[in-house]
From Swiss-Prot:
The keyword Mitochondrion does not apply. This is Leucine rich adaptor protein 1. The gene is LURAP1. Acts as an activator of the canonical NF-kappa-B pathway and drive the production of pro-inflammatory cytokines. Promotes the antigen (Ag)-presenting and priming function of dendritic cells via the canonical NF-kappa-B pathway. In concert with MYO18A and CDC42BPA/CDC42BPB, is involved in modulating lamellar actomyosin retrograde flow that is crucial to cell protrusion and migration. Activates CDC42BPA/CDC42BPB and targets it to actomyosin through its interaction with MYO18A, leading to MYL9/MLC2 phosphorylation and MYH9/MYH10-dependent actomyosin assembly in the lamella. It comes from Homo sapiens (Human). Residues 107-116 have a biased composition (Low complexity). The lineage of its organism: Eukaryota, Metazoa, Chordata, Craniata, Vertebrata. GO terms for biological process: positive regulation of canonical NF-kappaB signal transduction; positive regulation of cytokine production. LRR repeats lie at residues 55-83, 93-114. Keywords: Cytoplasm, Leucine-rich repeat, Phosphoprotein, Repeat. It is found in: Cytoplasm.
């Protein structure tokens, strides 16, 4: 009988853990008494008239009513615990949402302060900061071409018009390449065919020899300018 009564008593350990207090013994006794009366078939609802007129019957009716009220209190307590859990869950969601909103707003403000405008501007700025290889190549070719264009005419101007006498310094500047200049002279002489270019050191030319004709002089000047331009182009490309 006692095992049946204990098994029918509701388990209030979850409620005790959530509330933090132990269930009163009076409430447990009332629940046990209600179960005992239910099993014996003598449970009376509130408001039911008692057939007995003695004092014992009245005390029993009061105990049954008290147990019924305590059972209602337990149900109300369980509903309050459930409501409290729902309120805690809603408050947690609101706090998390507020934290995320403040974090996002701080990130957005930092992004605006860094970019000085819209967020898309930072992406465009990062793409614009990447080096453009095609533009660099075009600039390099233009700079090389402009350098060669400025070097070749200046050398032609320094050498003077065809037929004019040249100094030993100008001739030494043209043949400063040494063996490379000789090779270029031989190749160009072979291509021209009709031009017989004979390379001579500056010392031999100054010591004496037959004067060259103006046509040969002008052809040599043109060839030397072309060779010097090719040499400058090779040097710049190597750099």
């Amino acid at each position: 009988m006692e095992g049946t009564v204990e098994s029918q008593t509701p388990d209030l350990r979850d409620v005790e853990g959530k509330v933090g207090r132990k269930t009163p013994e009076g409430l447990l006794r009332g629940l046990r008494g209600e179960c005992e009366l239910g099993t014996s078939g003598a449970l009376l609802l509130p408001g039911a008239s008692s057939t007995g007129h003695d004092l014992g019957d009245k005390i029993m009716a009061l105990k049954m009513e008290l147990a019924y009220l305590r059972a209602i209190d337990v149900k109300i307590l369980q509903q309050l615990v459930t409501l409290n859990e729902g309120i805690e869950a809603v408050r947690w969601l609101l706090e998390e949402r507020g934290t995320l909103t403040s974090h996002c707003s701080s990130l957005t403000s930092s992004q605006y302060s860094l970019t000085g405008g819209s967020p898309g501007r930072s992406r465009r700025g990062s793409w614009d900061s990447l080096p453009d290889t095609s533009t660099t190549d075009r600039l390099d070719s233009v700079s090389i071409g402009s350098f060669l264009d400025t070097v070749a005419p200046s050398e032609l101007d320094e050498q003077g018009p065809p037929g004019a006498p040249r100094s030993e310094m100008d001739w030494a500047k043209v043949i400063a390449g040494g063996e490379r200049a000789r090779t270029e002279v031989d190749v160009a002489a072979t291509r021209l065919g009709s031009l017989r270019a004979v390379w001579k050191p500056p010392g031999e030319r100054l010591q004496g020899g037959p004067p060259e004709s103006p046509e040969d002089e002008s052809a040599k000047l043109g060839f030397e300018a072309h060779w010097f331009w090719e040499q400058c182009q090779d040097d710049v490309t190597f750099l």
